[in-house]
């Protein structure tokens, strides 16, 4: 008996040994790890157009400075995952970072590398396709750890119009309409974020800042607006509050349960309302349906809503449910997307019930049934109406998608176009690009046979209708950020101080009132365009509003290509998100440029010089003192053996250029040696420049990337800058005479072809402040600029006077020239320069009376050495000798 028990015990021990050994090894492995990465959340929610901080912290399992600790900086990698695809967002090690081009200017590590335990990621300007899983991975030596979190971007922008007519809302009416349907009027940032996520709508609509815009992914003749040939958000600028347009609404949180009521006999609108009330709910609003769709609701069944419209949400498109695009589909009576079905027609109904636990996102689409006819998408031919040149406005017709509805609630059943491949989610859809509808499609839309209408609307459980509210063109087939990766220093990773995606403009008198979205907003008509004003539009004068000039993302600069895996950085400096970058000048030489008073009164930027530098020598504790630059206010850091030295711009002093020696006048703002004042009053370019000159300034010149970021972020409007080619076509010069040291043109700009008069330059602030040339008679806001340090009137001399008209202020480095009065001869240098301390150089010119006969002797007597004529004097004229 005892041997049997011993054998059983031995067998039990041998059976348990592998598992126990594995547990011991696992514990040993866990204890042997140097650190563990934790995010601390399973799901995070962000708001469309907003910013989201994704936490990620490193927890050390043994002292970080122990003998076994790896030297150098840990390697941090953030990855975006969607389905079976992975996209690298950024990789950082110390002060070096590599950022995916699709995330450039949108991601930052606010604490790293100052804190090696906080590698949290900040993702700004959230888009719909930013929803997915984000993984944080940290590697240090041979140790690595990672954690992941799901991110959901909530919020949806949609076009809304009542069934009666297209373009029927004033600005106040638009706000009320969005509130009536359980939403609010969208902001420019939200519309732009939706556009970046693939949204397209060829219908002009109000936004919260009283501007009128519409997003276009695929430029086409009828939807070109003020950005002919380029994708982007078309913009009319601020228009009159009584003008009539559609409205873009924004819905975000559902805060309850939305469910489909589908009785066998269907319901009229009044019966649908009572149906919901009997179940302790109310008939859902349009905004609530959009919010539920954004949360995952997928129902291929048209149902009544509170505003009398009939709609249904589609997440997974199919051939029988409206084609290959996800979105909320709407049934219209007419091909121009107007007319809701009669309230006596019978449909299902969408009800909404307040609940602490919304369940709309868990709704699933109904199963497919065979033999069902498809919902027809009827398109109307696109048109473009152009006004004559004096009007500078035109009207565009939107792409039309609607379903003719019969009196019994049925719709057409013509064969739909071949659908694109059905994606799994709205953010993964890849569809055929929308092309302008043809004549045949329009004729099909008005010739639907009565017997081909729907017989049973329950068949709509597998059928969908397209409203072209969410368009994923072939060019944007992949919602995942892709593209080349560039490497930057960490100071370049953080997003700029400006919110790049803001589109607003301050209220001011708007452009001429023209109803309908313009196809060529504020642009002269092309050859062959009509010469009469189309009906429904009033003739307007030459004074125009502010267009948006491009929606094409700015091309990024390529950086170095060294790998992050090469080892830790040797530049341990604290990094944090920064705004405009510091101006750096690699030398101390003075500018050799000469500015005459007749052509310029300002030269920006003023480069640091020996005389301008009020800074001393600061001793630094280690090498790499100038990375990042310790100098403030645009000062230049120079490394020296004993430390570093800051060369200050005029107006600043101190060891680190942090002491202000001069200050701007009240109402002006200082930045890196210049003063700026913004005017929201809209003027033509010439009027704006004249107004600036009356203040002793000029329209702003942009000479550095830092100045570009400051002006664009500080004054978020379309605005004039001083660049123009009014003198010679194609030769762009700054109005203040500053050298052309920096350019930030929009792709394809400047494009003033055929002498169209686009001779002045506007800064389009929401496109990272990129520039476009436009006609000078546009009325835009503007910013004036003058030097922080300037000189007053030049010294007056009794026998000499300056060239040009006197001015009250002269910028640093401005050079004036004296000339002697008639009958006097000049001696010594006639030039004086405005110095960095705001004082003129002492004049050295002297004027003496001319000696009699001087002019004759200058023509006859040799002036140079050895009897040679001076190089700059003409040879005496001798009459030809006779042969």
From Swiss-Prot:
Sugar attachment sites: 129, 336, 413
Chain intervals with Acidic residues compositional bias: 440-451, 459-468
GO biological process: cell adhesion; hippocampus development; synapse maturation
Biased composition (Polar residues): 479-495
Domain Link residue range list: 156-251, 256-353
SUPFAM superfamilies: C-type lectin-like, Complement control module/SCR domain, Immunoglobulin
Pfam families: EGF, Lectin_C, Sushi, V-set, Xlink
All copies of domain C-type lectin, residue ranges: 658-786
Signal peptide: 1-22
Tissue: Expressed in the retina, specifically around the inner and outer segments of photoreceptors, retinal pigment epithelium, outer plexiform layer, and the ganglion cell layer (at protein level). Brain. Expressed in the brainstem and cerebellum in a perineuronal net pattern.
Span list, region Disordered: 402-592, 854-883
Residues of the Sushi domain: 789-849
PROSITE patterns noted in UniProt: C_TYPE_LECTIN_1, C_TYPE_LECTIN_2, EGF_1, EGF_2, EGF_3, IG_LIKE, IG_MHC, LINK_1
Protein modification: O-glycosylated; contains chondroitin sulfate.
Keyword annotations of the record: Disulfide bond, EGF-like domain, Extracellular matrix, Glycoprotein, Hyaluronic acid, Immunoglobulin domain, Lectin, Phosphoprotein, Proteoglycan, Repeat, Secreted, Signal, Sushi
Modified residues (Phosphoserine): 224, 413
GO CC terms of this entry: extracellular matrix; extracellular region; glutamatergic synapse; perineuronal net
Subcellular location: Secreted, Extracellular space, Extracellular matrix; Secreted
Positions with biased composition (Basic and acidic residues): 581-592
UniProt function note: May play a role in the terminally differentiating and the adult nervous system during postnatal development. Could stabilize interactions between hyaluronan (HA) and brain proteoglycans.
Assembly and oligomerization: Interacts with TNR.
UniProt name for this protein: Brevican core protein
